[in-house]
Amino acid sequence: MKKQVLILSILMLCSFLATQAQTKETRNVSTFTKISFRVPGKIYVRQGSPQKVVIEGKKEILKEIETDVDGSRLVIETDDKWDWNLWKDDDDEVIVYITVKDIDGLSVGGSGDLIGETKIITDDINLNVSGSGSMKVEVEASGDMEGDVSGSGNIDVRGKCKSFNSDVSGSGKAIVSLSISGNADFGVSGSGKIEADGSASSVKTSISGSGKVLAANLETNSCEVRISGSGDVEINVKNELDAIISGSGSVRYKGNPSKVNSASSGSGNVRKL
């Protein structure tokens, strides 16, 4: 009897260890150009061929991970019935490795982290982080690029594009290092921050709240600033600056613009750096 109990205990232990061991699975999915990552963990994205999706983690967790293509979007998420309390520590993280030929959209929802392992060459692209996650990519886009953050997460994007739009809502951050041949449009609502360097033909900036747009190292020909609240803007402008402040916000500028238009209702001010 004791021997049977011992054998049963060993079998149970082996079964438990098997579920706790790290394993890899290759998922077969249809063609996609967009990726949505909605689980705790890390995702590494490479642009190339052939298309490949590999997930790594504990076996008991991997069986709850869904990798479905909706239209042109690969969605990586858990089953709706998943008990998030089981995701206790770093050992429970899922790691995803993706190789894909064309990329025009990347998004992170929740606390995940997305890392671009290669430069992404594309036409237009949309980048988005919602929650406390992060994204770090290098992109060469011949068209338009968007990089938005909602929540406390952050985006770090480098490269070049025709136009760039970034909206940060909440306490998140966008770090931007881009050569922009056309217009850059920065918007912050809340206490978030945009840090930018590089160049752009023109810049539009709007802040609602206590956020910041720190772009003293972003060279531009003209800049339009609108602040409502206590937000702060720094910019490097060559030709024309137009700033309207409602509240206690401030605008600091580098360069020697030939034309500076400013108006303030409140204690806000516009000054040279």
Residue ranges and their predicted role:
Residues V5-L8, T19-S130, K136-D148, D156-N165, ...:
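Acidic (Asp/Glu) and glycine-rich low-complexity loops/linkers
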Residues M12-A18:
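Hydrophobic core
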Residues S134, N154, K193:
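Histidine-centered metal-chelating micro-motifs
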Residues V157-K162, G172-L273:
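Short, surface-exposed interaction patches in beta-rich subdomains
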